[in-house]
């Protein structure tokens, strides 16, 4: 996930503050936030299929199924980031590889580079048009990351200190930087997580960065003041004992006097039915960004690996990979109180 800054403005302008988004009038204290039901995200418009991957040449290296230099007509995507660049264009980056037919083994084979799609110059509402976002050259293939493992998953991008920082997994969590979103320089490893660490996402709040990520059946968070040195992890949420699957693609948002944790459910039973891209995402609320344990969801929202971001007018949007359409789709959302 990523926010939508004006070009290279300080990141503190993007922080989800209490006054920025038309919240409750006056100051909402922590106790009041607990007593009130917080607003929940509601999709209020159509899903528009803004990006469908075009046919492309597989850049390699060879995998069991895909061969370097061969052209494949159909590609699929997964976890992704959306951001507005200094060129006035909206960009999307994410997992990609040639499509795997339903029922074939290893539907995530060769996730070794990222797609890059870009819309024409103009505000997001003008780019909410089917097919408007077009493929650009793939980025960060293994040949450009020779000191890393081949896999590159779930990019998340924020502007910081005059650069765009991209975080990606799976473990070790690594990062790359860019000044323009077109040319990227891999910078290496940030940390490793015993077991697993994937799907990183970063929230900035009160001078502290919070990185949430998936590890097995839990969501973990680490904190940092400079994006380089990270604390030890805190487990902020876990699936109930006995549940199968996982809490994937987590996102933390600071809004409405507290914090939202949103994650996409991977249901192992659905996987047995060959449903690879599942689109049930769950919304949790807490006054403590490090504790969503033993809480019930306050809402469910459609979207696979959903990203939540704002446009130039401060309006909110959600994106989804592969559901309801191949590629990336976006829809407007509103934060509303439950009736």
Name what the model sees in each region.
Residues 1, 29-30:
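Intrinsically disordered, low-complexity serine/threonine-rich segments
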Residues 2-16:
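Bacterial N-terminal signal peptides that target proteins for export
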Residues 6, 22, 32-33:
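Short stretches within intrinsically disordered, low-complexity N-terminal or propeptide regions
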Residues 14-26:
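Bacterial N-terminal signal peptides
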Residues 31-249, 254-304, 310-339:
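Beta-rich carbohydrate-recognition and catalytic domains
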């Amino acid at each position: 996930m990523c926010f939508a800054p004006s070009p290279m403005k300080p990141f503190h302008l993007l922080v989800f503050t209490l006054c920025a988004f038309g919240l409750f009038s006056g100051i909402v204290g922590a106790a009041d936030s607990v007593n009130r039901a917080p607003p929940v995200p509601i999709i209020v418009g159509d899903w528009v299929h803004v990006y469908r991957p075009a046919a492309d040449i597989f850049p390699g290296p060879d995998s069991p199924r895909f061969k370097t230099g061969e052209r494949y007509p159909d590609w699929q995507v997964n976890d992704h980031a959306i951001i507005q660049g200094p060129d006035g264009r909206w960009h999307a980056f994410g997992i990609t590889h040639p499509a795997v037919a339903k029922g074939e083994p290893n539907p995530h084979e060769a996730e070794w580079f990222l797609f890059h799609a870009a819309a024409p110059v103009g505000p997001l509402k003008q780019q909410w048009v089917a097919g408007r976002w077009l493929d650009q050259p793939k980025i960060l293939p293994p040949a450009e990351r020779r000191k890393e493992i081949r896999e590159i998953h779930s990019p998340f991008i924020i502007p910081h200190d005059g650069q765009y920082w991209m975080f990606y997994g799976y473990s070790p969590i690594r990062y790359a930087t860019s000044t323009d979103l077109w040319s990227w320089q891999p910078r290496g490893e940030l940390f490793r997580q015993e077991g697993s660490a994937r799907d990183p996402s970063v929230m900035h709040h009160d001078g502290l960065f919070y990185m949430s990520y998936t590890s097995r059946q839990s969501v973990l968070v680490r904190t940092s003041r400079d994006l380089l040195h990270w604390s030890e992890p805190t487990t902020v949420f876990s699936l109930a004992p006995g549940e199968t699957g996982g809490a994937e693609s987590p996102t933390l948002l600071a809004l409405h006097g507290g914090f939202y944790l949103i994650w996409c459910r991977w249901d192992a039973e659905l996987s047995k039915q060959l449903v690879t891209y599942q689109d049930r995402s769950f919304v949790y609320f807490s006054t403590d960004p490090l504790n969503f344990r033993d809480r019930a969801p306050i809402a469910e929202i459609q979207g696979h690996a959903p990203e939540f971001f704002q446009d130039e007018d401060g309006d909110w949007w959600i994106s989804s990979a592969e559901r309801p359409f191949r590629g990336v789709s976006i829809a407007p959302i509103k934060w509303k109180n439950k009736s």
